[in-house]
Structure formats: structure tokens, C-alpha cells
Amino acid sequence: MKALTKTDFNFPGQKSVYHGKVRDVYNINGEKLVMVATDRISAFDVVLPEGIPYKGQMLNQIAAKFLDATTDICPNWKMATPDPMVTVGVLCEGFPVEMIVRGYLCGSAWRTYKSGVREICGVKLPDGMRENEKFPEPIVTPTTKAEMGLHDEDISKEEILKQGLATPEEYETLEKYTLALFKRGTEIAAERGLILVDTKYEFGKHNGTIYLMDEIHTPDSSRYFYSDGYQERFEKGEPQKQLSKEFVREWLMENGFQGKDGQKVPEMTPAIVQSISDRYIELFENITGEKFVKEDTSNIAERIEKNVMNFLSK
């Protein structure tokens, strides 16, 4: 089992390449983006030292499926998926914020709430809430998009408008799309016996139109609970059975790592890497309702290059 942790392609018309935490994005002629979902994994804004076999394929295929399932809600950037790990799409000018939407109080929002804070991103929260409790209505809690190595910061709607990161009309559209996409994602998850707990969306503009970009409803951008037993676990104050990257974060925390300065990433043994890969496959199959078909990983970079070249030459 091989994992793709770095890419160095040179496609026809390539103007630039951006290496993100997980994806490598190639700009073709200033018109299209070739986005490669690598097998890198990040947590606490740090890229971990080992790649996770098949993770890129899973992320790319889940995102493609949900982009196709939401085109009636808003336009999105996807044009094609010429390789299981690649999406080619329209080049958009991204808004410098991530639209995070939460249906339940958990993760970083719970950690903030537990510390006594009752307002997140300008959204006031009532007293007396418990971990993993459902909000009466989903809340939107945006963050800034940090440069590599820096942490994303919470930001309120007021601050976004004040800093000119979006106009009032644009922000209204972003929020409307965010809530509608989350509603659709929640409905699809429910059909599979899952709860979509929280997720994030990224948007950009192309020719004056706002497009949904990047990934959607993947285990890297979302948190899912199993609905079966949710209520019982909640009432007993027990941890929920979840499908997300949270299990990676928990493993890191148990081993003394939270992304803080001076902390060392614990060794990722082959068994840990295998278990993370297995969890991702479990999530893929649960959320799509389809069997995961492992692609040939004998020479991933060569396969991607061939498939993308074929697509671009059309």
C-alpha cells in the first residue's frame, strides 16, 4: 500500500502550483484548476509525517458525489474528475473566510463553551447546554483562512463586513448557501443512519457569480455521528460514536500533541496508519452507501499525470 504525499507535476499551460495541507492545486492558463487530493493528513493545522493510503481517493470521490448532489442549490466549481484523486474545476477568486456551520455543540465549539464563553463568532449561545447537544437551529461560525502554518481564527459576520472580506449582499448569499447545503447534507446523512454534526464550505467568485469550491461533506471538512444510539449516549453523557478526523486528533492529544509550539508529533506506526485508513474507508462506505473500490497504487503519480494530460488535451 503506497500513499501519495507530494506531487510535482508540470502540466501544459501550468502557471503556478499551490501546496496546501492536503491538496495540491495546479493553475492551468489562469482558467482552470487541477486539484489533487493527496494522502497527506493534517490535524491541529499541522501536516502529519505519514500519508494515509487511499485517503485522497476517498476524499475526492465523496466531494465529487456531493458536489453533483447539490448543483440545484448553488453553482460549484467542478468540471470533471479525470482521476480518482483529481478534480478539475473553474478557477474562482476565493473569499478569505471559511463558512463553518454547526448543528450540534461539540469539538472546538464545546471546548470554548465549556471554558465559560457564551458567544462564538457573534452568535450568542444559551446557558445550560451540554456536549453534543443539538442547537435549536444550525449556527454559522466563520473562520479566517490562515496561511500555511498559522491557525484559522474565528470571525463574526460584523467583522467580515467591517474588514471588507465580503459585501453585505455577498455575505447574505454565502450564509444562505451554507445553510441550504447543510440542510441537504443533513438529509443525505440521515438516509444513511448518520448525523451531519458540523462542516465547512469555501466559496469564490467567477465572472461575478458565487461558486461553491473545494471539498464538501468529506470526513476532513465535516464531523458525523451515528444516529443509532445518539440520544441514549447524549442522555448518559457518554462520548458519541463518530466518523470524522476527530479520532486522529484524540489519538494525538492522548500522545501529548495539540499542535502547540515545541510539541513533537508522536510516531505514527504502520498499525496506526492502517487503522486511520480503515476508518476513512468505513466513513466512505457509510456516507455514500457504496463499496469503496481501491485504485491501483503501484505508481500513483504516473497514473494521475496520464489521466490529467488526457483530459487537458481534449
Swiss-Prot record:
User: Keyword ATP-binding: yes or no?
Assistant: yes
Record keywords: ATP-binding, Ligase, Nucleotide-binding, Purine biosynthesis
Q: What class of enzyme is it?
A: ligase
User: Record's InterPro entries?
Assistant: SAICAR_synt/ADE2_N, SAICAR_synthetase_CS
- Name a single GO biological process: 'de novo' IMP biosynthetic process
Quick check: keyword Lyase in the entry?
no
Q: Which domain of life is it from?
A: Bacteria
EC number, as in UniProt: 6.3.2.6
Name the CDD domains for this protein. Answer: SAICAR_synt_Sc
Substrates-to-products reaction catalysed: 5-amino-1-(5-phospho-D-ribosyl)imidazole-4-carboxylate + L-aspartate + ATP = (2S)-2-[5-amino-1-(5-phospho-beta-D-ribosyl)imidazole-4-carboxamido]succinate + ADP + phosphate + 2 H(+)
Query: What pathway is it annotated to?
Result: Purine metabolism; IMP biosynthesis via de novo pathway; 5-amino-1-(5-phospho-D-ribosyl)imidazole-4-carboxamide from 5-amino-1-(5-phospho-D-ribosyl)imidazole-4-carboxylate: step 1/2
* GO MF annotations in UniProt: ATP binding; phosphoribosylaminoimidazolesuccinocarboxamide synthase activity
Read off the PANTHER family from this record. PHOSPHORIBOSYLAMINOIMIDAZOLE-SUCCINOCARBOXAMIDE SYNTHASE
Query: Which protein family is it in?
Result: Belongs to the SAICAR synthetase family.
HAMAP family attached to this UniProt entry: SAICAR_synth (MF_00137)
Q: What is this protein called?
A: Phosphoribosylaminoimidazole-succinocarboxamide synthase
Species of origin reads: Bacteroides thetaiotaomicron (strain ATCC 29148 / DSM 2079 / JCM 5827 / CCUG 10774 / NCTC 10582 / VPI-5482 / E50)
Q: What gene, per UniProt, encodes this protein?
A: purC
